[in-house]
């Protein structure tokens, strides 16, 4: 992703320059041209202005008298001077630039009625903008837009944004969250300057620009939460192994973004997209009031996230999520109300777990939990509408009745169960929602959602009876399938003895937990401590590359999966998930013959059939890479080798269980092909 200094512009850069020169370019057009690549330095200012929607905005400072006379003016001047001193600016330009920066901060304080303080971090927000050498009016407009759209309100110690981040961390990494909680290391104590400066506080100018290139094009203020999450996830092993004092650990955490390099940013965003795709939409929808200038929707009972036991999900999302196809968030709903309430009426897909049992009959409760986990596993495997990797607990919606449910929730969280949420408002909210959308209407698709196992009925149920999938099991508790990615994050590294030029082999042993390589072919990662390990393997770059090199005819070709697997020339078959750049995953099969590798993508609506998504010659594989923290996420790069280097033509990513075995087999087959060609 590095910029090519002095290199001739590529075709996409020319397209971008022409589009920007013509004017009238919108963000969608810009995104389609850039496709996640790092911006050329000379075009960055124009792209950022489009992304911030300030193109054509007037000069807000035009009517201002220019008086620099705030009570805290001396502090503003001092901070601005320190910024100028750190910049490589010609002497004759320093005074003008200093006045511009000081004017921007002063006018913002006056117009917004805000008292300036150095701890606000505005100087760090301005630093990447100052590097763009913008006119004063554009500098102010860009600064204002960033403050308004991307810096959340209450971004201070014990502020609401950090309570929300803790809930997100707990949702994806309960073990890490619990560890930090016990150490009383709250997110605001280490991430205040991450969020308040959009990482510019600790990151170099080049790294900050690369982060902002992607972040501003995302146009999603909540995406910063997932970037923060990945930084923690990748420091997890080091954090959990720490035995130092709290202050030293906080310093380590707070400064961890400083270890980022430009080459890491593509992977940082890719992993953030993955976690984003595994997060309920309610995370955004219920907290949209954090960003923007509007104060609408801010209520006292909405803002106190510090007391939340876990992430809350709306009942409308629960109903919609389990009807959709594809790789979105799907919920396995656990109804924790007493048996008589459950029998009178319940969500037809809900599993019943009587929370009263936790105190009244602990052994029966433990057996019910085992049954729950087994039922969840079976419902996922069978493709049931009730199936989902995400556990969502539903109570009655009455605080005094839900006390035991909260104890059950705490039980699962203490067991470090990932993807645990609560249905906001409980069953009462579900009933109200179904009433609001007139569930009894003949054309409404939700009519089957309420079921009863007794003679009594809810006032708004349908005529469909149904039981929960309440099967018992003597087996051990089953971990959620979502551990595909996150189990790999919890493991420790081992050395890989065999190194092959141009290949990274990531081996795994046949036990429950995967192990990953700590060796790397190519340049070693900067620094001694493994603080941040995205990119510890060879980097891959999708600049100018179509992620799939097959023709339209290939896309349309439908084949029988088993027939293809049984073909005599197929040497290996690896069930996997194809991973797209947006984080979406598609169940697939990688088939390896003597000379080729095929990706068959399963067709959800046609069991046993698949599209030929990709066919690649083995001798066109120029690189196989994996990530130290994600040994199951494998990237294949295809291309040609010539005197001027390697030309990459296609890049494909797969999430492969036992990826070490798969890459080893593929590598050996590639070597056979290359040996045959040489002989």
From Swiss-Prot:
The protein's matches in InterPro entries, at most eight in alphabetical order, are given as: Rab-GAP-TBC_dom, Rab-GAP_TBC_sf, Rhodanese-like_dom, Rhodanese-like_dom_sf, TBC1D23, TBC1D23_C
Rhodanese domain location, by residue?
327-439
**Which Gene Ontology BP terms does the record give?**
embryonic brain development; retrograde transport, endosome to Golgi; vesicle tethering to Golgi
Q: What is its main location?
A: Golgi
Alphabetically sorted, this entry's keywords are: Developmental protein, Golgi apparatus
Q: Which Pfam families match?
A: RabGAP-TBC, Rhodanese, TBC1D23_C
Compositional bias, Low complexity, is annotated for 454-468
What GO cellular component term, any one, is given?
A: cytosol
Per UniProt, subcellular location reads as: Golgi apparatus, trans-Golgi network
Q: Which CDD domains match?
A: TBC1D23_C-like (cd20788)
Per UniProt, residues of the Rab-GAP TBC domain are 38-219
Q: Where is this region: Disordered?
A: 454-478
What this chain does, per the record?
A: Putative Rab GTPase-activating protein which plays a role in vesicular trafficking. Involved in endosome-to-Golgi trafficking. Acts as a bridging protein by binding simultaneously to golgins, located at the trans-Golgi, and to the WASH complex, located on endosome-derived vesicles. Plays a role in brain development. May act as a general inhibitor of innate immunity signaling.
What protein is this chain from? TBC1 domain family member 23
């Amino acid at each position: 992703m590095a910029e090519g200094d002095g290199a001739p512009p590529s075709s996409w850069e020319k397209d971008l320059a022409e589009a920007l020169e013509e004017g009238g370019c919108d963000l969608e057009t810009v995104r389609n041209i850039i496709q996640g690549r790092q911006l050329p330095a000379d075009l960055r200012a124009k792209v950022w202005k489009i992304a911030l929607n300030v193109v054509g905005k007037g000069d807000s400072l035009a009517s201002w008298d220019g008086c620099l006379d705030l009570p805290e003016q001396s502090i503003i001047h001092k901070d601005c001077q320190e910024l100028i001193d750190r910049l490589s600016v010609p002497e004759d330009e320093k005074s003008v630039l200093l006045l511009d920066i000081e004017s921007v901060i002063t006018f913002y304080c006056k117009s917004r009625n805000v008292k300036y303080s150095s701890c606000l971090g505005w100087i760090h927000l301005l630093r990447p903008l100052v590097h763009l050498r913008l006119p004063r009016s554009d500098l102010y407009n860009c600064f204002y837009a960033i403050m308004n759209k991307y810096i959340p309100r209450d971004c201070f110690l014990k502020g609401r944004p950090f309570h929300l981040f803790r809930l997100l961390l707990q949702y994806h990494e309960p073990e890490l969250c619990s560890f930090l909680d016990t150490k009383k290391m709250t997110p605001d104590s280490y991430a205040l300057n991450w969020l308040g400066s959009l990482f510019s506080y600790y990151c170099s100018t080049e790294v900050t620009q690369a982060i902002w290139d992607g972040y501003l094009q995302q146009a999603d203020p909540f995406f910063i939460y997932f970037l923060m999450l990945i930084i923690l996830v990748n420091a997890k092993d080091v954090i959990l192994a720490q035995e130092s004092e709290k202050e030293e650990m906080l310093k380590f955490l707070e400064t961890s973004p400083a270890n980022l390099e430009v080459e890491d940013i593509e992977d940082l965003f890719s992993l953030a997209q993955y976690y984003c795709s595994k997060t309920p939409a309610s995370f955004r929808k219920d907290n949209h009031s954090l960003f923007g200038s509007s104060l609408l929707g801010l209520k006292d009972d909405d803002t106190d996230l510090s007391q939340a036991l876990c992430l809350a999900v709306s009942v409308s999302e629960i109903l919609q999520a389990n009807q959709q196809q594809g790789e979105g968030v799907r919920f396995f709903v656990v109804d924790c109300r007493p048996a008589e309430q459950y029998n009178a009426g319940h969500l037809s897909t809900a599993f019943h777990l009587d929370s009263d049992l936790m105190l009244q009959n602990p052994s029966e409760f433990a057996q019910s939990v085992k049954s729950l986990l087994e039922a969840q596993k079976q419902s996922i495997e069978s493709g049931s509408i009730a199936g989902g990797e995400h556990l969502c607990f539903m109570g009655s919606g009455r605080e005094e009745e839900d006390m035991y449910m909260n104890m059950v929730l705490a039980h699962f969280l203490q067991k470090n169960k990932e993807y645990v949420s609560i249905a906001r408002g409980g069953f009462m909210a579900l009933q109200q929602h179904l009433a609001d959308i007139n569930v009894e209407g003949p054309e409404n698709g939700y009519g089957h959602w309420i079921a009863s196992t007794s003679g009594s009925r809810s006032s708004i149920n349908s005529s469909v009876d149904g039981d929960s999938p309440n099967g018992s099991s003597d087996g051990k508790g089953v971990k959620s399938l979502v551990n595909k990615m996150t189990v790999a994050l919890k493991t420790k590294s081992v050395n890989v003895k065999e190194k092959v030029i141009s290949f990274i082999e990531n081996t795994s042993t046949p036990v429950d937990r995967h192990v990953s390589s700590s060796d790397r072919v190519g340049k070693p990662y900067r620094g001694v401590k493994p603080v941040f390990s995205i990119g510890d393997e060879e980097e891959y770059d999708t600049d100018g590359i179509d992620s799939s090199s097959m023709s339209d005819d290939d896309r349309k070709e439908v084949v029988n999966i088993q027939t293809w697997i049984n073909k005599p020339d197929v040497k290996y078959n690896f069930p996997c998930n194809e991973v797209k750049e947006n984080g979406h995953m598609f169940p697939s099969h990688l088939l390896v013959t003597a000379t080729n590798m095929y990706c068959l993508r399963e067709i959800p609506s046609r069991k046993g059939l698949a599209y030929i998504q990709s066919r690649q010659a083995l001798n066109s594989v120029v690189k196989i890479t994996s990530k130290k923290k994600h040994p199951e996420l494998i990237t294949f790069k295809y291309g040609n080798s010539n005197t001027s280097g390697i030309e990459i033509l296609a890049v494909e990513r797969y999430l492969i269980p036992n990826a070490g075995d798969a890459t080893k087999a593929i590598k050996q087959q590639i070597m056979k092909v290359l040996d045959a060609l040489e002989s």
